[in-house]
Every structure is written in structure tokens, then in C-alpha cells.
Amino acid sequence: MKNKVAIIGKGNIGWAIKELLKDTYEIKQGDITEGFDARDINQVREFLKDVDAVISAGPFAINKNIGTVAAELNIGYFDLTEDVETTDFIRGIKSENVMMPQCGLAPGAINICAASLMKDFDHVSEAMMRVGALPRFTTNEMSYYLSWSTNGLINEYCNEADAIYEGKCIKVMPLEGAEKMIIEGESYEAFNTSGGCATMCETYENKVDNLSYKTIRYPGHLNHMKFLFNDLHLKKNKDVLEKLFDKEVPRTTNDVIIFFVKVIGEIDGILQEKTYLRKIYGDDRFSAIQRTTASGVCSCLEMYFKDQIPKKGFTKQESILWEDFTSNQFGKVYL
């Protein structure tokens, strides 16, 4: 008998998750466009009463209700959120089953990969996680088209980010910390955005010297965002900014994911570096952001049903083995 999985959210990522899982699991999917409102906790209780696990693929604001009910019903819980406050709430829920937020691309797969690379070192001087969800071709001044949740994008650009500096956890400002990158001969820029470190800063505080996550974009994007968010103070009017982006910034499925981890440290007394780089493209079925994000949470779900992750309580991304994550039919997209 197939395990029954509920997917809440039927947008681009929710659809992709269902497409990946439908041959292996019995799927039950709900969305506000079909009358299911996850903001109503009683509707959530009714929807989840007969499933083995739930994936939240909707806006992060609904995750608190879903996580609360998942714990009540003793079912596995997974989400994709980059929102730190929501993750802290999920962490505080007492459950006899797995509670695993942040199971997408970044946070998610990037943290699992970085933790795996760091294990090779006797001492880590610096761990750098860099991810970009980029259009393959752009002609606008932003050098950017939308390929995923506008709400999630704005949230990442507005909130403080976590990092480790000289062994201690710190907060850094979004849209700051700009750096130039050259990857396989092509120029990019990277800067601070929130959520990408997940829980790694608390895990590695006093264990590594420096650790950071930044978002990759084409050169010039950051200056335009600082003008909108800071100079025009639109970070205080997120609803206005979201409507503006959705109306005026084109959406694309012709995208590429740049997945980059670099770790510098000592191995047997010698300073060394190791890098993991993948460029992941879309195909006729999925865009690149759909493939990577949906595959991340689907791989975690598969590991859950194979008893490869703990079955009780809050589970950190960095506690997952990269070898297990990439060995199943979903996680192999990152190889």
C-alpha cells in the first residue's frame, strides 16, 4: 500500500511536487483557489486527518497552522520556508514525529551539501554557500525575471540574515555584503539575503571561523534593489512592492540554478579548499527552480519513509547525510 501524502499549495512548486511524487505515493492536494483555506485551523485538521505526512508548499504564513495540526495528528511535517520566525515557531512545537522545515533549495539542499563538505576538514576557516535562481536571458535593467514566489523573494530581501563571524553568530543586513564572483568565466554578484543559513549558525558557532549564505545575481541587480527597497522605502510597503513586481516583472521558466559551496580550512595541517558547483537547468517538464526546490523536499520525504532521518521532533537540514539525500530518485538532480 502506498503512503498517503498531503500537499498544501498548488502553485508552481506545489504542482511540481505532486508531479514528482504521484507515481510513488497516494497524493491529496489542497489549495485556496479550490476552497481550502489553511488559515482556518479546523479546515487543516479535516484535510490532514487521514494522511501519513504533509508538505506545505504555500505561503510561509500558513505553516504555523499546518505544523500545529501535523503534531496533533502525529504525522510527518515538511515545508519549504525561508522565513526564520516561522521556522522558530515550528521548532517550538512538541511532536512525536519529524518536524522538518526549510526543505527546498536554499535553505535545504545547500545546507546539506555544505555540512557534508565541512566534515572533510579538521578545522574550517570559512564556509560559503551561494545560490542563484536566474533567468538564462535578460534584457531589463534589473537583470532579473521572476521564476518563483514573489512573496518569498521580497521576504528574503527585507529581513536580517544569519552568519558566523570569527566563531560567533551575528546578524547581517539584507542587500549588504556585496561581493563579485566569477564562475566558469562568467561574472556575477552576491549579497546577503535572509534564511539561507537555516539553523547552521547555531550548529557551528564556536566550531567554524566564518560561515555565510548569499544570493547570486547578475551584476547590477543589487543597486536597483537597494534603490527600491531602501531609497524608496518600499521594504516598509511589501504589499505594494509585491503587486509592482507581479505586474511589471516578467515571469520565466527558462531559468538556471547556480548551486555553489566553497569551504576553506585545514586538513592534516595543510590549508585547503573544496568546492561543489552545479548549474541545473530546466527541461520540457519543469523549470530549474521547480526541479531543484521540489526535488529537495521530495528527497527528504523519501528519506523519512525509508527511516533515514529521525522520526521525532525538529530536524535540521545539516543533520541529513548528503549521500542519502542524493541517492534517491529525487535528490540525484543535485549530482
Per-region residue spans from a language model:
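NAD(P)-binding Rossmann-fold cofactor-contacting core
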Residues: 24-37
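C-terminal catalytic/substrate-binding lobe primarily of soluble NAD(P)-dependent oxidoreductases
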Residues: 120-335
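Rossmann-fold NAD(P)-binding glycine/threonine-rich loop
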Residues: 81-101
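N-terminal Rossmann-like NAD(P) cofactor-binding module of classical short-chain dehydrogenase/reductase
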Residues: 52-57, 78
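Conserved N-terminal Rossmann-fold NAD(P)-binding element of oxidoreductases
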Residues: 5-9
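ADP-ribose/adenylate-binding Rossmann-like module
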Residues: 69-87
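Conserved Rossmann-fold cofactor-binding substructure of NAD(P)-dependent oxidoreductases
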Residues: 39-50
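Hydrophobic/small residue at the entry helix of a nucleotide-binding pocket
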Residues: 13
